[in-house]
A protein has these predicted regions:
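Ser/Thr-rich, Proline-interspersed low-complexity disordered segments
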Residues: 2-3, 327, 331, 335, ...
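Flexible loop/hinge segments at secondary-structure junctions
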Residues: 1-338
Length: 376
């Protein structure tokens, strides 16, 4: 079955199997993961899912892991796919400096402790229309390693001379307490590398970047992060999908637009891994559910970014291997799959008996069990 068609089926029909699974997730995606667990449980009466917080339930086993860059799931993996994106932003705590323009070279100097005042002459030259104050620069040194790495990859790629390595003023710190970080950012003059979701959810000020001379500056926005996401290319090996940003590819304009937003290319991916074991089929069903387009909307709702369609479709195809294909129940449901998703695939692959006409009623999500389960 073509991956695109399988993704359409995953969107319209919830695949249900019997089982009981625990899903381990990173703290920042706790609410997103809980929404997926709740949605799957509501649709599948014989599948029970729960969320495990590894920092709290240290010894609790898990059947599915959702991890951040640099983290390795503690299991024998049988399938994996990117499941969402969080960009990396540079926050500034100086009134009136939202969007203040930096070059990679000046940002490197600031994060290395070489820019001591927000009235720096080079910064003023880059921002002639902003009245800068002589506020001391306070560098928040503690930075998550994945955030430093993502920003470093982007900055060094566009200006290797001005950004030769991770700035010396930063200290790798994997711990990240949101309340503590927010409190530290209240100090006037602070500059810090933080997740873009933190910026979005707390309305923080951020800098913009001049990626090339005489080119419009790039801001970290929903549109610019989505634009960068369209430059990601999926690679599939069996049930495993990885994705990497290819900066040589032109970003794809959003629907209804002729021109794509300038991409903000400091990105981190979250990866979803299904573990081998007695619950692996249920784990695959959860992964498939999380990669549905409707389910991906939870990422956006909580300040993150959903995977680009090309990567998402590849992920659905990979994690679905071995799962029963959704079929239409013999009663209480439309008799034929809508024309728009059955054009290239014979009807008998997705329906149990031929029909002479398409029902006039809207198609509801149904499960592949003998009788329809309510969906949400």
């Amino acid at each position: 079955m073509p991956p695109e068609f399988k993704a359409e089926l995953a969107e319209r029909y919830v695949t249900c199997v019997s089982g009981e699974i625990a899903v381990s997730t990173v703290p920042e995606l706790l609410e997103v993961t809980q929404s997926w667990v709740d949605g799957l449980s509501e649709n599948c009466s014989d599948l029970t899912a729960s969320v495990v917080e590894p920092e709290v339930d240290v010894e609790a086993p898990a059947d599915v892991f959702i991890t951040a860059p640099g983290q390795t799931p503690e299991c024998n993996a049988i399938a994996a796919s990117p499941v969402g994106i969080d960009a990396v932003a540079v926050s500034v705590s100086v009134e009136g400096l939202d969007g203040v323009l930096f070059t990679p070279e000046l940002l490197h100097r600031a994060l290395s402790g070489g820019m001591t005042s927000w009235a720096d002459p080079e910064l003023q030259e880059l921002n002639p229309d902003i009245e800068l104050s002589d506020t001391p620069v306070v560098v928040r040194a503690a930075t998550r390693p994945q955030d430093a790495a993502a920003l470093n990859e982007w900055m060094s790629r566009i200006d290797s001379a001005g950004w030769p390595a991770i700035p010396s003023g930063l200290v790798s710190d994997a711990s990240f307490d949101i309340d503590t970080v927010i409190t530290e950012l209240e100090t006037e003059g602070t500059i810090a590398i933080v997740p873009a979701s933190l910026v979005t959810n707390n309305s923080l000020q951020t800098i913009s970047i001049q990626t090339q001379p005489d080119i419009e500056s790039t801001f970290v926005t929903v549109e610019s992060v989505i634009s960068a996401g369209t430059q990601m290319v999926a690679t599939t090996s069996g049930s495993f999908v990885t994705a990497a940003l290819d900066a040589s590819l032109p970003p794809i304009p959003a629907a209804g637009n002729d021109v794509a937003s300038l991409p903000w290319q400091a990105l981190n991916q979250f990866t979803m891994t299904v573990c081998a074991g007695s619950n692996e089929e249920a784990g695959r069903a959860f992964a498939r559910y999380a990669l549905r387009l409707e389910s991906q909307g939870a990422m956006t709702s909580f300040g993150f970014t959903e995977m680009h369609e090309q990567v998402r479709v590849a992920g659905v195809d990979a994690v679905s291997q071995g799962l029963p294909e959704p079929t239409i129940p013999p009663s209480g449901a439309p008799e034929e799959v809508p024309e728009e998703i059955s054009t290239d695939v014979p009807t008998e692959e997705v329906t149990e008996e031929p029909s002479e006409e398409v029902t006039e009623e809207p198609l509801e999500e149904v499960t592949d069990e003998a009788s329809p389960e309510p969906t949400s």
